[in-house]
């Protein structure tokens, strides 16, 4: 008997360490995959500028991750449970690393980045063709040299990023469905919310690192080390600036490959957490029988696929959850993917500043919310139903607060000929014949060039030539333009490189926007886990992996892939001025109509989120009559523990045992 107790105790320690170690390894994998994903999102603007592509193509590149995920999600979710899940997760992490490495290759295969400019790196009178010079022919038109047009084919290098992101999506496929199902299979049902909360925290810690990495890389010039940055005429706030995006992808590749190592040492199955509490070994015998039954089912690996699909499609709560998720994810992907671009244009910040602010303000409350709701559900034994009702009310409250964002806005950058007249009067639409004015009509300036300068009068101009400037002093970003005929001020009628900065009032509004985002992020994190628990518990245990995979499949097909594409195309329609390539073709957008941009960015997600509350309300109604498997399992566990107590009491009170046993069964039924 002593040997049996010793064996049970040893098994308890081993079981505890394995399930916790797997949770730790999976959390690390979540950190690495979310690090790569968030870094990719922070670098979208840099990729857009590097390859001179419109936002719609950038959205397609971003959505290509979901395409890669889509290729294998159903296969992995169903057949993956029949195979060695930890090893499949490890292989997926390696593939993610290879995808990140491929995404960094264009930097090494293409030449140096040449931003659109007419300004010479040095200031000397013989090269000042970018200034206002009367009685000259217009020589600043896009070059039509065929040799230079061939060089522009290098812009197709973005295909490497596209393919690399697809491969990264393929590698990410097994991590969530197989990892979640592995924990759900071998963890106590009451521990699942806490474990999932820990995993979600890992998904938040990864973005924290990713945003810090993105902010750092965005502040470094893309060709640092190979060019003299003192000769640059652009700063990180310029829409032509490209940060060192490739450095972060190399780091992400290494982190993903390292995260794969622990999974190759985990067994295919683990003992169910908590089974060691039964000293008679009854539950251990049941577990062994369950293992044998699973082995028999593996011989017919495909026979249950169609019945499972039919069962899931006939589950009303599950199907409504998919509809709700599709609408919500459409909204959140659109908002999050283009949040850096929106803050850059709305509040006049650089990519590095914006990315850092997003990380500092948004991610800590999300992390706290994930841990808090997981702890509360475990500590106070809150049922999935109660948590779902609470999540719905909080989410609706946060949705109403969202409309305050419409009041936290700034005006367009005042650019003469684009968003304002040369007298400084703002006008909403761009009219091309207003780019030229009496003050610069004799300068023979190009109307397509984009070398913005800020005048002493607080008004920006598309170029020093269009500002009527006839002289320049200094070099690089310190260059100053003087004798500008279009600048009417009490000073020297001079201008400096770059757009004019927005005032302190706009900076204060940015703080209000970030505070609102903190509240929204915290409430979102609290409502996310109850919603995910409803998804896990509304389907049968044997259908769990397939159900998770099908849910991911639908959200990718109807949200993850199309959302950034159509949203990017809508953003492109708000562009006021496109960059110009050497062959005269349009490049990346340099200036947006921020009023139209704001309407698209805020209104469309609001409409999508608002429509998602209707199916969510039907879910709450259907849940009243639905018995969740997790709640049944919990009651059966209590009944088993009660029966053990009853057996002990039979030794002293034979007549009392039937009454206690019946009471326990009655409580279970209630």
UniProtKB/Swiss-Prot annotation:
Optimum pH is 6.5 with estrone 3-sulfate, taurocholate, prostaglandin E2 and L-thyroxine (T4) as substrates. It catalyses: taurocholate(out) = taurocholate(in); glycocholate(out) = glycocholate(in); taurochenodeoxycholate(out) = taurochenodeoxycholate(in); tauroursodeoxycholate(out) = tauroursodeoxycholate(in). Residues 41-59, 112-155, 225-242, 334-353, 406-513, 572-605 are extracellular. Pfam families: Kazal_2, OATP. Residues 1-20, 81-86, 185-203, 268-311, 378-381, 537-545, 624-670 are cytoplasmic. It is found in: Cell membrane; Basal cell membrane. Keywords: Cell membrane, Disulfide bond, Glycoprotein, Ion transport, Lipid transport, Membrane, Transmembrane, Transmembrane helix, Transport. The keyword Cell membrane applies. Coiled coil: none annotated. The chain crosses the membrane at residues 21-40, 60-80, 87-111, 156-184, 204-224, 243-267, 312-333, 354-377, 382-405, 514-536, 546-571, 606-623. It is a multi-pass membrane protein. One of its GO terms (molecular function) is bile acid transmembrane transporter activity. InterPro entries: Kazal_dom, Kazal_dom_sf, MFS_dom, MFS_trans_sf, OATP. It comes from the Eukaryota. Signal peptide: none annotated. A conserved histidine residue in the third TMD (His-107) may play an essential role in the pH sensitivity of SLCO1A5/OATP1A5-mediated substrate transport. Na(+)-independent transporter that mediates the cellular uptake of a broad range of organic anions such as the endogenous bile salts cholate and deoxycholate, either in their unconjugated or conjugated forms (taurocholate and glycocholate), estrone 3-sulfate and prostaglandin E2, at the plasma membrane. Responsible for intestinal absorption of bile acids. Capable of thyroid hormone transport (both T3 or 3,3',5'-triiodo-L-thyronine, and T4 or L-tyroxine). Belongs to the organo anion transporter (TC 2.A.60) family. This is Solute carrier organic anion transporter family member 1A5. It comes from Rattus norvegicus. The gene is Slco1a5.
